[in-house]
Amino acid sequence: MLSKGTKVGAPQYTVEELTALVDEAHSRGLKVASHAHGTQGIINALHAGADTIEHASFIDEEGIRLATANNAALSMDIYVTEYILGEGASAGILEESLEKERMTGSTQRANFRKAVEAGATIVYGTDAGVYPHGQNARQFSRMVRFGMTPLQAIQSATVTAAEVMGWGYDVGKIEAGFAADFVAVKGNPLGNIELLEEPAAVIKGGVRYR
């Protein structure tokens, strides 16, 4: 999307190339995240055995079916389109990229809803680095707006993400024996998910940073 001279949706690797990459990574105990907006690129990555699909903007019913069957997770950053189209130009994002975003954002959100309704595994993802750190919690309310319950959105960033990354034994839960990583908010985020945008406390590894 932000790369110069690229066409939205055009796959850049064959299934054979992707399979070689995935097999090598898995043989070393590594997870594979596939950066894919386009329908065919998503399907290629899923056939190759990718563990997660980043963006998945133009995923279709076949892609959703494959992701579910393969237990692959979708990381669909549906807030970022608002930042890019609202503040991107002043932040130096090229018009070429702004035009790509105009072509993509609404479709990605519609497909996010379809993936949620189909029961696909969805993990919280924000395309970190595109917009200022600290705004990333805005993703939660968009996930709820486009089909998730507040609990599902919170789980996508905690227990579900931990399990997808293979870290479910150590993080993702508030439970004895797990890392003391959590935030506190003034109220119940199950009733108002936007509370997560203003945490009253941030604890990482048992140390309070805010």
Please report, for each region that a protein language model flagged, where it lies by residue.
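Active-site core of metal-dependent hydrolases
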Residues: L2-Q108, A128-V130, G147-T149, A162-M165, ...
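Small/polar (Gly/Ser/Thr/Ala-rich) solvent-exposed segments
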Residues: G191
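His/Asp/Glu-enriched, well-ordered alpha-helical/loop segment
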Residues: S27-K31, E96, T104-N188
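Short aromatic-centered micro-motifs
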Residues: V202
